Amino acid sequence: MVPRIFAPAYVSVCLLLLCPREVIAPAGSEPWLCQPAPRCGDKIYNPLEQCCYNDAIVSLSETRQCGPPCTFWPCFELCCLDSFGLTNDFVVKLKVQGVNSQCHSSPISSKCESRRRFP
């Protein structure tokens, strides 16, 4: 029997001898992703910082012009033309998460000023 003083040292030596000295990985292994990375065309982007808008990677904080009087966030909103008669009305609508959002079915976020259209 091993004296109590040597027991921790004995366990440590056994562990060092039994454990491999380097990490063993299966042949042909590479990092695995838990889910597919989002793509914009052929480029991968980080959805926590960016989105894909018209096949371009855009920062979440970037804004764009929606008609002359309005701005909108392309990562979160749609710029929709709502034209009737002689006016060009622009409406900013919310993108619905998890759905391919379209102007006719999305809820309105804000309405932009009208501008007369001259022939």
Curated annotation (Swiss-Prot):
- Write out the tissue specificity statement of the associated record: Detected in cerebellum, heart, placenta, spleen, stomach, testis and thymus.
GO MF annotations in UniProt: signaling receptor binding
Domain of life of the source: Eukaryota
Q: Which InterPro entries match?
A: IGFL
Write out the GO cellular component annotations: extracellular space
Q: Indicate where this protein resides in the cell.
A: Secreted
**Keyword set for this entry?**
Secreted, Signal
What is the annotated signal peptide range for this record? 1-25
Pfam name, any one: IGFL
The entry sums up its family as follows: Belongs to the IGFL family.
PANTHER family the UniProt entry points to: INSULIN GROWTH FACTOR-LIKE FAMILY MEMBER 2, INSULIN GROWTH FACTOR-LIKE FAMILY MEMBER 3-RELATED
Task of the protein: Potential ligand of the IGFLR1 cell membrane receptor.
Annotated protein name in UniProt: Insulin growth factor-like family member 2
Recorded source organism is Homo sapiens
Which gene is the coding source of this polypeptide chain? Answer: IGFL2
